[in-house]
Protein backbone atom coordinates (compact mmCIF):
# COMPACT_ATOMS: atom_id res chain seq x y z
CA UNK A 1 0.00 0.00 0.00
CA UNK A 2 1.19 3.52 -0.75
CA UNK A 3 -0.32 5.75 1.96
CA UNK A 4 -0.06 9.42 1.06
CA UNK A 5 -0.07 10.90 4.55
CA UNK A 6 2.98 9.12 6.05
CA UNK A 7 4.81 9.25 2.71
CA UNK A 8 4.55 13.04 2.52
CA UNK A 9 5.54 13.39 6.16
CA UNK A 10 8.53 11.05 5.84
CA UNK A 11 9.87 12.77 2.72
CA UNK A 12 9.54 16.25 4.20
CA UNK A 13 11.10 15.19 7.51
CA UNK A 14 14.06 13.59 5.74
CA UNK A 15 14.50 16.78 3.73
CA UNK A 16 14.20 18.92 6.84
CA UNK A 17 17.00 16.97 8.52
CA UNK A 18 19.25 17.67 5.55
CA UNK A 19 18.22 21.33 5.43
CA UNK A 20 19.18 21.84 9.07
CA UNK A 21 22.21 19.54 9.30
CA UNK A 22 23.62 19.52 5.78
CA UNK A 23 27.25 19.45 6.91
CA UNK A 24 26.72 16.14 8.71
CA UNK A 25 25.55 14.45 5.52
CA UNK A 26 28.28 16.06 3.44
CA UNK A 27 31.12 15.17 5.82
CA UNK A 28 30.00 11.54 6.08
CA UNK A 29 29.43 11.12 2.35
CA UNK A 30 25.70 10.54 2.73
CA UNK A 31 24.31 13.43 0.68
CA UNK A 32 24.03 11.50 -2.59
CA UNK A 33 22.18 8.70 -0.82
CA UNK A 34 19.79 11.14 0.87
CA UNK A 35 19.17 12.92 -2.43
CA UNK A 36 18.40 9.63 -4.16
CA UNK A 37 15.73 8.87 -1.57
CA UNK A 38 14.09 12.30 -1.50
CA UNK A 39 14.17 12.56 -5.30
CA UNK A 40 12.41 9.22 -5.53
CA UNK A 41 9.73 10.43 -3.14
CA UNK A 42 9.39 13.64 -5.15
CA UNK A 43 9.06 11.80 -8.44
CA UNK A 44 6.27 9.69 -6.97
CA UNK A 45 4.40 12.76 -5.69
CA UNK A 46 4.68 14.43 -9.10
CA UNK A 47 3.62 11.27 -10.90
CA UNK A 48 0.56 11.21 -8.64
CA UNK A 49 -0.43 14.75 -9.67
CA UNK A 50 -2.21 15.89 -12.84
CA UNK A 51 -1.55 19.50 -13.83
CA UNK A 52 -3.31 21.74 -16.30
CA UNK A 53 -0.84 24.55 -16.63
CA UNK A 54 -0.04 25.43 -13.02
CA UNK A 55 -3.30 24.06 -11.63
CA UNK A 56 -3.89 20.64 -10.10
CA UNK A 57 -6.91 18.99 -11.69
CA UNK A 58 -6.66 15.85 -9.58
CA UNK A 59 -4.11 13.83 -7.67
CA UNK A 60 -3.68 10.32 -6.31
CA UNK A 61 -3.50 10.16 -2.53
CA UNK A 62 -3.42 6.39 -1.97
CA UNK A 63 -2.73 3.22 -3.90
CA UNK A 64 -4.02 -0.09 -2.57
CA UNK A 65 -6.19 -0.90 0.40
CA UNK A 66 -4.85 -1.35 3.89
CA UNK A 67 -7.67 -3.29 5.47
CA UNK A 68 -9.61 -6.48 5.05
CA UNK A 69 -8.24 -9.24 2.88
CA UNK A 70 -6.06 -6.96 0.79
CA UNK A 71 -2.45 -5.91 1.33
CA UNK A 72 -2.56 -5.75 5.10
CA UNK A 73 -4.18 -9.17 5.25
CA UNK A 74 -1.34 -10.80 3.33
CA UNK A 75 1.95 -11.84 4.93
CA UNK A 76 4.88 -12.26 2.58
CA UNK A 77 7.00 -10.33 0.06
CA UNK A 78 5.07 -8.19 -2.40
CA UNK A 79 6.68 -10.03 -5.32
CA UNK A 80 4.80 -13.22 -4.43
CA UNK A 81 1.43 -11.54 -3.90
CA UNK A 82 -0.01 -12.82 -7.15
CA UNK A 83 -3.67 -12.52 -6.10
CA UNK A 84 -3.56 -8.71 -5.98
CA UNK A 85 -0.85 -8.04 -8.55
CA UNK A 86 -2.06 -5.42 -11.01
CA UNK A 87 -5.43 -5.02 -9.27
CA UNK A 88 -4.79 -2.39 -6.64
CA UNK A 89 -7.16 0.56 -6.55
CA UNK A 90 -5.67 4.02 -7.03
CA UNK A 91 -7.60 6.71 -5.14
CA UNK A 92 -7.79 10.05 -6.94
CA UNK A 93 -9.59 13.24 -5.98
CA UNK A 94 -10.37 16.47 -7.79
CA UNK A 95 -11.64 18.36 -4.74
CA UNK A 96 -10.38 16.86 -1.50
CA UNK A 97 -7.55 15.32 0.51
CA UNK A 98 -6.22 18.78 1.35
CA UNK A 99 -4.11 17.27 4.13
CA UNK A 100 -2.25 14.94 1.79
CA UNK A 101 -1.92 17.54 -0.98
CA UNK A 102 -0.25 19.84 1.55
CA UNK A 103 1.99 17.02 2.80
CA UNK A 104 3.16 16.37 -0.78
CA UNK A 105 3.65 20.12 -1.25
CA UNK A 106 5.87 20.44 1.82
CA UNK A 107 8.05 17.51 0.74
CA UNK A 108 8.47 18.90 -2.77
CA UNK A 109 9.22 22.41 -1.52
CA UNK A 110 11.96 21.33 0.86
CA UNK A 111 13.45 19.09 -1.83
CA UNK A 112 13.55 22.10 -4.14
CA UNK A 113 15.31 24.15 -1.46
CA UNK A 114 17.84 21.38 -0.89
CA UNK A 115 18.59 20.35 -4.47
CA UNK A 116 17.12 22.97 -6.82
CA UNK A 117 14.79 21.00 -9.12
CA UNK A 118 12.41 23.64 -10.53
CA UNK A 119 9.75 21.01 -11.27
CA UNK A 120 9.58 20.21 -7.56
CA UNK A 121 8.73 23.83 -6.79
CA UNK A 122 6.16 24.03 -9.59
CA UNK A 123 4.27 21.03 -8.24
CA UNK A 124 4.67 22.15 -4.62
CA UNK A 125 3.00 25.49 -5.35
CA UNK A 126 0.20 23.88 -7.34
CA UNK A 127 -0.55 21.27 -4.66
CA UNK A 128 -0.60 23.94 -1.97
CA UNK A 129 -3.07 26.01 -4.01
CA UNK A 130 -5.24 22.91 -4.45
CA UNK A 131 -5.13 22.20 -0.73
CA UNK A 132 -6.19 25.66 0.44
CA UNK A 133 -8.82 25.94 -2.30
CA UNK A 134 -10.85 22.94 -1.13
CA UNK A 135 -10.09 22.76 2.61
CA UNK A 136 -11.32 19.22 2.85
CA UNK A 137 -9.61 16.40 4.68
CA UNK A 138 -8.71 13.00 3.27
CA UNK A 139 -11.32 11.42 1.05
CA UNK A 140 -13.03 8.25 2.15
CA UNK A 141 -11.27 5.00 1.33
CA UNK A 142 -11.73 1.47 2.47
CA UNK A 143 -8.56 1.81 4.53
CA UNK A 144 -8.79 2.39 8.27
CA UNK A 145 -5.15 3.44 8.45
CA UNK A 146 -3.46 6.86 8.52
CA UNK A 147 -6.70 8.82 8.60
CA UNK A 148 -5.73 12.42 9.23
CA UNK A 149 -7.62 14.53 11.76
CA UNK A 150 -7.28 17.77 9.84
CA UNK A 151 -5.44 19.72 7.19
CA UNK A 152 -4.66 23.10 8.78
CA UNK A 153 -1.30 22.08 10.26
CA UNK A 154 -0.24 20.46 6.97
CA UNK A 155 -1.05 23.64 5.07
CA UNK A 156 0.96 25.78 7.51
CA UNK A 157 3.90 23.35 7.25
CA UNK A 158 3.81 23.59 3.45
CA UNK A 159 3.40 27.38 3.59
CA UNK A 160 6.54 27.69 5.69
CA UNK A 161 8.64 25.76 3.20
CA UNK A 162 7.15 27.61 0.25
CA UNK A 163 7.98 30.94 1.87
CA UNK A 164 11.58 29.82 2.35
CA UNK A 165 11.64 28.60 -1.26
CA UNK A 166 10.10 31.68 -2.88
CA UNK A 167 10.03 34.63 -0.48
CA UNK A 168 6.36 35.13 -1.43
CA UNK A 169 4.75 36.95 1.49
CA UNK A 170 1.37 35.25 0.97
CA UNK A 171 2.84 32.02 2.33
CA UNK A 172 4.24 33.86 5.33
CA UNK A 173 0.83 35.42 5.96
CA UNK A 174 -0.78 31.97 6.05
CA UNK A 175 1.86 30.71 8.48
CA UNK A 176 1.42 33.80 10.67
CA UNK A 177 -2.33 33.17 10.81
CA UNK A 178 -1.81 29.55 11.84
CA UNK A 179 0.63 30.57 14.56
CA UNK A 180 -1.88 33.00 16.04
CA UNK A 181 -5.08 30.98 15.61
CA UNK A 182 -6.92 29.00 18.25
CA UNK A 183 -9.64 27.30 16.21
CA UNK A 184 -9.68 26.79 12.46
CA UNK A 185 -9.64 23.90 10.05
CA UNK A 186 -12.09 21.13 9.31
CA UNK A 187 -12.97 20.30 12.91
CA UNK A 188 -11.82 23.47 14.59
CA UNK A 189 -8.21 22.32 14.78
CA UNK A 190 -6.18 24.72 16.84
CA UNK A 191 -3.35 26.70 15.42
CA UNK A 192 -0.46 27.57 17.70
CA UNK A 193 -1.83 30.64 19.46
CA UNK A 194 -1.22 28.93 22.80
CA UNK A 195 1.89 27.06 21.68
CA UNK A 196 2.78 23.66 20.25
CA UNK A 197 0.67 20.82 21.60
CA UNK A 198 1.91 17.66 19.86
CA UNK A 199 5.19 15.96 18.97
CA UNK A 200 6.07 16.03 15.29
CA UNK A 201 4.34 13.11 13.56
CA UNK A 202 2.50 12.25 10.36
CA UNK A 203 -0.84 13.30 11.86
CA UNK A 204 0.32 16.63 13.31
CA UNK A 205 3.14 18.74 11.94
CA UNK A 206 2.39 21.83 14.05
CA UNK A 207 5.81 21.53 15.69
CA UNK A 208 7.51 21.74 12.31
CA UNK A 209 5.44 24.74 11.27
CA UNK A 210 6.16 26.47 14.58
CA UNK A 211 9.92 25.94 14.28
CA UNK A 212 9.94 27.29 10.72
CA UNK A 213 8.03 30.34 11.92
CA UNK A 214 10.51 30.92 14.74
CA UNK A 215 13.48 30.50 12.41
CA UNK A 216 11.98 33.05 10.03
CA UNK A 217 10.96 35.67 12.59
CA UNK A 218 13.69 35.05 15.18
CA UNK A 219 11.03 36.14 17.65
CA UNK A 220 11.43 35.15 21.30
CA UNK A 221 7.67 34.71 21.60
CA UNK A 222 7.58 32.36 18.60
CA UNK A 223 10.46 30.32 19.99
CA UNK A 224 8.69 30.19 23.36
CA UNK A 225 5.79 28.35 21.73
CA UNK A 226 8.27 25.65 20.76
CA UNK A 227 10.43 25.53 23.88
CA UNK A 228 7.55 25.48 26.35
CA UNK A 229 6.45 22.21 24.77
CA UNK A 230 9.97 20.77 24.57
CA UNK A 231 10.63 21.69 28.21
CA UNK A 232 7.69 19.48 29.17
CA UNK A 233 9.17 16.50 27.30
CA UNK A 234 12.94 16.80 27.74
CA UNK A 235 12.79 16.31 31.49
CA UNK A 236 15.20 13.44 32.21
CA UNK A 237 18.48 12.15 30.84
CA UNK A 238 18.18 8.90 32.79
CA UNK A 239 14.63 7.89 31.90
CA UNK A 240 13.40 6.92 28.45
CA UNK A 241 10.92 9.45 27.07
CA UNK A 242 7.73 7.56 26.16
CA UNK A 243 5.01 9.66 24.54
CA UNK A 244 2.75 6.75 23.61
CA UNK A 245 2.71 2.98 24.01
CA UNK A 246 2.49 2.35 20.25
CA UNK A 247 5.73 3.10 18.46
CA UNK A 248 7.23 5.05 21.35
CA UNK A 249 10.67 5.23 19.71
CA UNK A 250 9.21 7.02 16.69
CA UNK A 251 8.00 9.84 18.94
CA UNK A 252 11.23 9.81 20.94
CA UNK A 253 13.47 10.38 17.92
CA UNK A 254 11.08 12.97 16.45
CA UNK A 255 11.26 15.00 19.65
CA UNK A 256 15.04 14.53 19.65
CA UNK A 257 15.22 15.91 16.13
CA UNK A 258 13.07 18.96 16.84
CA UNK A 259 14.93 19.56 20.11
CA UNK A 260 18.27 19.47 18.29
CA UNK A 261 17.02 21.89 15.64
CA UNK A 262 15.85 24.21 18.41
CA UNK A 263 19.28 23.86 20.04
CA UNK A 264 20.94 24.82 16.76
CA UNK A 265 19.25 28.20 17.13
CA UNK A 266 19.95 28.51 20.85
CA UNK A 267 20.98 32.14 20.54
CA UNK A 268 17.39 32.92 19.58
CA UNK A 269 15.56 30.07 21.32
CA UNK A 270 17.52 30.33 24.56
CA UNK A 271 17.56 26.54 24.92
CA UNK A 272 20.01 23.70 24.40
CA UNK A 273 18.58 20.18 24.55
CA UNK A 274 21.62 18.46 23.02
CA UNK A 275 22.62 16.56 26.15
CA UNK A 276 19.07 15.27 26.63
CA UNK A 277 18.85 14.12 23.00
CA UNK A 278 22.23 12.37 23.24
CA UNK A 279 21.10 10.50 26.35
CA UNK A 280 17.83 9.44 24.71
CA UNK A 281 19.62 8.22 21.58
CA UNK A 282 22.02 6.31 23.80
CA UNK A 283 19.09 4.45 25.36
CA UNK A 284 17.67 3.64 21.93
CA UNK A 285 21.06 2.26 20.86
CA UNK A 286 21.44 0.03 23.91
CA UNK A 287 22.45 2.14 26.90
CA UNK A 288 19.50 0.96 28.97
CA UNK A 289 18.66 -1.60 31.65
CA UNK A 290 18.33 -4.48 29.16
CA UNK A 291 21.23 -3.70 26.82
CA UNK A 292 18.88 -4.12 23.87
CA UNK A 293 18.86 -1.53 21.11
CA UNK A 294 15.99 -0.66 18.79
CA UNK A 295 17.78 -0.45 15.42
CA UNK A 296 17.79 -3.61 13.31
CA UNK A 297 21.25 -4.78 12.24
CA UNK A 298 23.11 -2.34 14.48
CA UNK A 299 24.81 -5.01 16.61
CA UNK A 300 24.22 -8.38 18.23
CA UNK A 301 21.63 -6.90 20.59
CA UNK A 302 19.48 -5.53 17.78
CA UNK A 303 15.88 -6.66 17.16
CA UNK A 304 15.76 -10.03 15.42
CA UNK A 305 12.04 -10.19 14.63
CA UNK A 306 10.78 -6.85 13.27
CA UNK A 307 7.16 -6.82 12.13
CA UNK A 308 7.97 -6.55 8.41
CA UNK A 309 6.61 -8.86 5.76
CA UNK A 310 9.41 -8.94 3.21
CA UNK A 311 12.19 -9.09 5.78
CA UNK A 312 10.55 -11.94 7.67
CA UNK A 313 11.08 -14.43 4.86
CA UNK A 314 8.02 -16.33 6.09
CA UNK A 315 5.49 -17.73 3.65
CA UNK A 316 1.87 -16.66 3.57
CA UNK A 317 -0.53 -18.39 5.94
CA UNK A 318 -4.26 -18.06 5.16
CA UNK A 319 -5.07 -17.54 8.82
CA UNK A 320 -4.82 -14.11 10.39
CA UNK A 321 -1.51 -12.48 11.22
CA UNK A 322 -1.49 -13.55 14.84
CA UNK A 323 -1.91 -17.30 14.36
CA UNK A 324 0.92 -18.58 12.11
CA UNK A 325 3.94 -20.15 13.76
CA UNK A 326 6.63 -17.50 13.72
CA UNK A 327 9.28 -19.60 15.44
CA UNK A 328 11.97 -19.19 12.77
CA UNK A 329 14.36 -16.24 12.88
CA UNK A 330 13.65 -13.61 10.23
CA UNK A 331 15.11 -14.62 6.90
CA UNK A 332 16.54 -11.18 6.15
CA UNK A 333 18.04 -8.38 8.23
CA UNK A 334 16.25 -5.07 7.66
CA UNK A 335 19.40 -3.04 8.31
CA UNK A 336 18.80 0.34 9.92
CA UNK A 337 15.09 0.02 10.62
CA UNK A 338 13.86 1.56 13.88
CA UNK A 339 11.30 -0.62 15.68
CA UNK A 340 8.47 0.65 17.86
CA UNK A 341 10.21 0.21 21.19
CA UNK A 342 9.09 -0.08 24.82
CA UNK A 343 5.47 0.51 25.78
CA UNK A 344 6.58 2.55 28.80
CA UNK A 345 9.62 4.23 30.30
CA UNK A 346 11.09 0.86 31.33
CA UNK A 347 12.92 -0.98 28.52
CA UNK A 348 11.77 -4.31 29.95
CA UNK A 349 8.40 -3.58 28.30
CA UNK A 350 9.98 -3.93 24.84
CA UNK A 351 8.96 -7.17 23.11
CA UNK A 352 11.08 -8.45 20.21
CA UNK A 353 8.32 -10.43 18.50
CA UNK A 354 7.25 -10.44 14.88
CA UNK A 355 3.59 -10.57 15.95
CA UNK A 356 3.89 -7.51 18.19
CA UNK A 357 3.16 -4.53 15.95
CA UNK A 358 3.09 -2.18 18.94
CA UNK A 359 6.71 -2.84 19.97
CA UNK A 360 8.24 -4.19 16.79
CA UNK A 361 6.60 -2.55 13.80
CA UNK A 362 8.83 -0.53 11.47
CA UNK A 363 7.78 2.33 9.21
CA UNK A 364 9.10 5.11 7.00
CA UNK A 365 7.99 7.81 9.42
CA UNK A 366 9.81 6.06 12.29
CA UNK A 367 13.12 6.20 10.42
CA UNK A 368 12.70 9.74 9.12
CA UNK A 369 13.01 11.12 12.65
CA UNK A 370 15.85 8.75 13.52
CA UNK A 371 17.96 9.99 10.61
CA UNK A 372 17.32 13.65 11.45
CA UNK A 373 18.18 13.13 15.11
CA UNK A 374 21.38 11.26 14.24
CA UNK A 375 22.44 14.06 11.88
CA UNK A 376 21.75 16.63 14.59
CA UNK A 377 23.78 14.72 17.15
CA UNK A 378 26.70 14.29 14.76
CA UNK A 379 26.59 18.01 13.98
CA UNK A 380 26.70 18.81 17.69
CA UNK A 381 29.25 16.29 18.95
CA UNK A 382 31.28 15.37 15.84
CA UNK A 383 31.80 11.86 17.18
CA UNK A 384 31.30 8.44 15.66
CA UNK A 385 32.04 7.07 12.23
CA UNK A 386 30.46 4.97 9.52
CA UNK A 387 30.27 1.37 10.68
CA UNK A 388 31.73 -0.40 7.67
CA UNK A 389 31.15 -3.85 9.17
CA UNK A 390 27.40 -3.51 8.57
CA UNK A 391 26.63 -4.76 5.04
CA UNK A 392 25.74 -1.89 2.73
CA UNK A 393 26.92 0.90 5.03
CA UNK A 394 29.50 3.24 3.54
CA UNK A 395 29.11 1.79 0.06
CA UNK A 396 28.84 4.01 -2.99
CA UNK A 397 25.15 4.95 -3.32
CA UNK A 398 23.32 3.21 -6.16
CA UNK A 399 20.40 4.53 -8.15
CA UNK A 400 18.17 1.54 -7.57
CA UNK A 401 18.04 0.98 -3.83
CA UNK A 402 14.32 0.88 -3.10
CA UNK A 403 14.62 -1.83 -0.48
CA UNK A 404 17.76 -3.20 1.16
CA UNK A 405 17.70 -6.51 2.96
CA UNK A 406 20.39 -8.78 4.28
CA UNK A 407 20.02 -12.52 4.40
CA UNK A 408 20.32 -13.85 7.91
CA UNK A 409 22.59 -16.75 6.93
CA UNK A 410 24.94 -15.24 4.39
CA UNK A 411 24.87 -11.52 5.34
CA UNK A 412 24.73 -10.62 1.66
CA UNK A 413 22.83 -7.56 0.54
CA UNK A 414 20.28 -7.16 -2.21
CA UNK A 415 18.75 -3.92 -3.41
CA UNK A 416 15.37 -4.60 -4.96
CA UNK A 417 13.17 -2.30 -7.01
CA UNK A 418 9.67 -3.45 -7.78
CA UNK A 419 8.53 -0.47 -9.84
CA UNK A 420 7.03 -1.02 -13.27
CA UNK A 421 9.43 -0.65 -16.18
CA UNK A 422 9.00 2.63 -18.02
CA UNK A 423 10.40 1.23 -21.26
CA UNK A 424 10.23 -2.10 -23.02
CA UNK A 425 13.98 -2.29 -23.54
CA UNK A 426 15.58 -3.49 -20.35
CA UNK A 427 19.14 -3.11 -19.22
CA UNK A 428 20.82 -6.41 -18.42
CA UNK A 429 21.01 -7.52 -14.83
CA UNK A 430 24.54 -7.77 -13.49
CA UNK A 431 25.24 -10.25 -10.73
CA UNK A 432 28.44 -10.05 -8.69
CA UNK A 433 29.31 -13.71 -8.23
CA UNK A 434 29.51 -14.88 -4.66
CA UNK A 435 28.20 -11.80 -2.87
CA UNK A 436 24.52 -12.02 -3.73
CA UNK A 437 24.39 -8.44 -5.04
CA UNK A 438 22.89 -7.29 -8.30
CA UNK A 439 22.15 -3.93 -9.87
CA UNK A 440 19.34 -2.56 -12.00
CA UNK A 441 18.70 0.70 -13.72
CA UNK A 442 15.95 2.88 -12.27
CA UNK A 443 12.42 1.67 -13.16
CA UNK A 444 13.58 -1.65 -14.54
CA UNK A 445 11.65 -4.75 -13.54
CA UNK A 446 13.02 -7.24 -11.08
CA UNK A 447 11.46 -10.64 -11.76
CA UNK A 448 11.25 -12.34 -8.40
CA UNK A 449 11.18 -15.93 -9.66
CA UNK A 450 14.35 -15.36 -11.71
CA UNK A 451 16.44 -14.07 -8.81
CA UNK A 452 19.20 -16.20 -7.30
CA UNK A 453 17.98 -18.06 -4.23
CA UNK A 454 20.06 -15.95 -1.85
CA UNK A 455 18.55 -12.75 -3.22
CA UNK A 456 14.98 -13.96 -2.80
Q: Which functions belong to the PLM regions below?
A:
Residues 37-53, 122-139, 166-196, 219-240, ...:
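Long, well-ordered core segments of solenoidal/helical folds
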Residues 36-83, 117-122, 126-128, 135-147:
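Active-site acid/base region of carbohydrate-active enzymes
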Residues 136-148, 153-157, 164, 178-181:
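Structural signature of Gram-negative outer-membrane beta-barrels, strongest in the C-terminal barrel
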Residues 1-43:
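N-terminal structural segment of carbohydrate-active enzymes
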Residues 397-430:
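Extracellular mucin-like PTS domains
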Amino acid sequence: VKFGMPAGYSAATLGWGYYEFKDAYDSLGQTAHLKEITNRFSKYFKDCTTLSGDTVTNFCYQIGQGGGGNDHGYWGPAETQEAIKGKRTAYWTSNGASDIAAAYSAALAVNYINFGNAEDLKYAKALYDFSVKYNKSENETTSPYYNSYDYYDDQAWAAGWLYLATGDSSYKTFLDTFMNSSGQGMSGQSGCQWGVYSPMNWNNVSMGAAILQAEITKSASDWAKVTTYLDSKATSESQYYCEDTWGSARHNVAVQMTALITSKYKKESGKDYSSWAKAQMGMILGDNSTGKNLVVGFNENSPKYPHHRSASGHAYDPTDEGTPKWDAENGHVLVGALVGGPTGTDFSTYNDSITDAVSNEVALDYNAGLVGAAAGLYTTYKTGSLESSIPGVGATPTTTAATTTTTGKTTTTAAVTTTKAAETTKAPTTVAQGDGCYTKKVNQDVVYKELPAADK
